[in-house]
From Swiss-Prot:
GO-annotated cellular components: nucleolus
Keyword flag GTP-binding: no
UniProt keywords, alphabetically: Acyltransferase, ATP-binding, Nucleotide-binding, Nucleus, rRNA processing, Transferase, tRNA processing
Source domain of life: Eukaryota
Domain N-acetyltransferase: 546-729
Residues annotated as binding ATP: 286-295, 458
Any Pfam family the entry gives: tRNA_bind_2
Primary localisation category: nucleus
Function: RNA cytidine acetyltransferase with specificity toward both 18S rRNA and tRNAs. Catalyzes the formation of N(4)-acetylcytidine (ac4C) in 18S rRNA. Required for early nucleolar cleavages of precursor rRNA at sites A0, A1 and A2 during 18S rRNA synthesis. Catalyzes the formation of ac4C in serine and leucine tRNAs. Requires a tRNA-binding adapter protein for full tRNA acetyltransferase activity but not for 18S rRNA acetylation.
Name this polypeptide is given: RNA cytidine acetyltransferase 2
InterPro entries, per the entry: GNAT_dom, NAT10, NAT10/TcmA_helicase, P-loop_NTPase, TmcA/NAT10/Kre33, TmcA_N, tRNA_bind_dom
Entries under HAMAP family matching the protein: RNA_acetyltr_Nat10
Amino acid sequence: MRKKVDERIRTLIENGVKLRHRSMFVIIGDKSRDQIVNLHHMLSKAVIKCNPSVLWCYKDKLDISSHKQKRSKQLKRLRERGQLDPEKLDAFSRLLDVGRVTHCLYKDSERILGNTFGMCILQDFEALTPNLLARTIETVEGGGLVVLILRSLTSLTSLCTMVMDVHDRFRTESHSEAAGRFNERFLLSLASCKACVVMDDELNILPLSSHIRSITQVPTEKDSEGLSEAERDLKSLKEDLSDDFPVGPLIKKCCTLDQGKAVVTFFDAILDKALRSIVALIASRGRGKSAALGLAVAGAVAAGYSNIYITAPSPDNLKTFFEFVCKGFDALEYKEHLDYDVVKSANPDFKKAVVRINIFKQHRQTIQYIQPHEHEKLSQVELLVIDEAAAIPLPVVKSLLGPYLVFLSSTVSGYEGTGRSLSLKLLQQLDEQSRAPATGLEGSGCLFKKIELTESIRYGSGDPIESWLNGLLCLDVATCLPNPACHPSPSQCDLYYVNRDTLFSYHKDSELFLQRMMALCVSSHYKNSPNDLQLLADAPAHHLFVLLGPVDESQNKIPDILCVIQVCLEGKISENSALQSLRDGHSPYGDQIPWKFCEQFRDTEFPGFSGARIVRIAVHPNAMKMGYGSAAVELLTRYFEGQIAPISEAEDKVDVEHAPIKVTEAAEKVSMLEEQVKPRTNLPPLLVPLHDRRPEKLHYIGVSFGLTLDLFRFWRKHNFAPFYVSQIPSAVTGEHTCMLLKPLKNDELEVNESDELGFFTPFYKDFKIRFSKLLSDKFKKMDYKLAMSVLNPKINFAEVDSSGSSSGGFLKTLNGILSPYDMERLRAYTENLTDFNLVYDICKTLAHQYFEEKLPVSLSYVQASILLCLGLQETDFSSIERQMQLERGQIHSLLLKVARELYKYLNGVAGKEIKSALPRLKERELTAHNVSVDDDIREGAKQVEEQMKKEKIEGLMDSELQQYVIGDKEAEALQHSKISSSGIISVKSTKSENENGFDKSTKKRSSDKRSSSSSKSKSSKKRKSLKE
């Protein structure tokens, strides 16, 4: 049966087409898909052109296949079963066949960026996230429709209790009940959107959309040519510049007056060719920033610029930029392949994105993409374009600036807007520098211009869907943050707990407080996304605290927010879960610090501790460096230690937010056409003083952030100690992720009261040793100041410490560390007998021992830093000169002082040990005589004489006395004879004549022989006696 469509629906669509405003329809019911054909038909008649294109987004499955052949078979089966009305079936299939429908999975929604559709259909509401909602709605052109299909809902309030797919990521082992605050706020916000209609599957408008009850046709202010005022101004600008080359042809490619003026401003800077000139272009999403930059770069090529570089977080962000560079070339009558070539990347990570354009019409010119951290390639640059600068870390953006022309663009709101406070910090600094006189310093005296685009390309200004989406997702909150009325002393400020039920209730005052709080987070140095809002609203473990000054209750106004802290409760993980995670090598969502601690130290007890992780801490941009952040951290620490309110003994009865309350209690008792949805009235207070709420029982507070020197020093100042630094830096920010802990005073843990780190001390020492060993490889490029802050070495030792008696950790021996030869080389270096190359290996050894606090030698900060750079990071002297701004001679002088101090201590500890270990020659012991020299000579002479006598007697030979031998007969005769008076006897010889009278010559030779031997014997005896 045919039914007349409510005229207000048709009027809303036609008004949107006339004003180039988008309209939104929320259809509730199982047959909501059938009404899409009717809405598409009404839109086609209103736009008076070809059928509007359709984007159909879904989770994982379509009711009717997007494949033509499969769809025909599927529709045939449904027709045979009688499950579809043939008339409706034919209309729907006709829409799919000729309606230019693009189907897209939610997980693949990034590929639709930059495309424009006339109608967007969103089904499977449970899979939607704030990011997906913003990303898909932004693709709809002015006059188009956004259709949200909600099936299987018995009432509108059942949307508040719907379980979303993203809730699985919010649940942890100790916090398993996710809330539906975001959906409740989403539902209530639909009533405030003037271009949104909520209806059932029969196109009956529900009471929630009572605001369109009196909708009427709107007149359009157009001239005889059918142009609006903005369109007339743009036409006039194009006509005025039509004769100017090359800006005239480029202006014809602009779609809005703002975009045209931006191109003219860019081209003025190009022709000026002033050094250190910066033009900044800021706008919300969809204003044509990248297109304006592309046209301006095409004009720079025509003006003769040769080296043009473009940088962005990823080449994917430059698709529109390079597209409009080529369109600019077409307008200037450049021909591809004849005048220029487009080069695509071969890197698979860049997905064949355009990275270079080579131009060779006039002379060789290049438009080249570089990554943000490659600033060293800018030596020959003439024009640098920085697109999406807000997504690049602020220090990196500053390093890219130099003595050349810079075009800078950034999204300051919308779902791509980031919270790097680019417009509040960098642009403010550039503006101040441009006003200051040139002093010769870097960055001074630069020319700075700022352009802001307000008119959207896709839809007309004042689009109600854009306003609704910005308010729902807190996207355009830059104007919602007023300056504090005063800056009270941090000691006078108090920390308050924020009740999230009241915060997301869509009450007027609560909504204003939420917008200001999110504006404060966006203006801080954190990168934000719309998904963070849903996490903040629905995650059961997350809590909010705000620091406020003294509140005057007599004034009925919202107090100024000085600081916001977002806290996530973690821990209470069973030991079985921890063991399972170690075995599988996979950590579940949430509980970042417990899982990372368990992974790093293989400790299964720590995940059972309960703790709180500070997700973010954001201070008002006009109250920075005033102590409010430190005051908030101190108050939060005291609160969780039970110093402000007593800690609850029964943890299950902690007064957290109340359980989610239904928007209307009688919703299930009335029909959908009679259901009234309004904000709750019986809400608890938004702000709760800490002394009125019992804190959870915790063992520690932790924090995780991108490692920078200022942030690390802030947390170390509050006694947080690191236990993890990621070895691989972030591809987006270039920062290493760092996690720190601060143990809280707890009666359940037995620790040494004098140790401020408590149970965490041994883990912290182990981390420092591991970090020092990684400095030569993974953290070699880390700034020495940051490395010194992470290690936090003790460099000032008292005299009692230097003696080694106050600590058992000091070196007592050099066994296994330095050999005696090493000590000799070190001594030679300290005495200037050799150069540093001879002791470079010793420097690395001593550096590790010193930073492990085993050498109690007091050094200055600069001396310790040089030891760290050379010994731990193993950098060269040129790098140290560049980082520390010191001359090489100064570095060598300081290094020599370090070596002398270390050698002095080592020599005192193990000096005797070193001497005993060195090899040496054997020494002889000489003793004095007990007698005088004269007595010694006389005694020696006496000995010689006695020896000579003895040798003389023994020297007589038998052969020499043979001639005097008496034979036997002669002896017998002598016995019988008498001796004469003369004493001579005569004996008869028995030998022959020759025998008795041997040869005279023989006698003579024997005589000479005896005489010579006798003389030799005497002379040898004399020499022997002299020696003795």
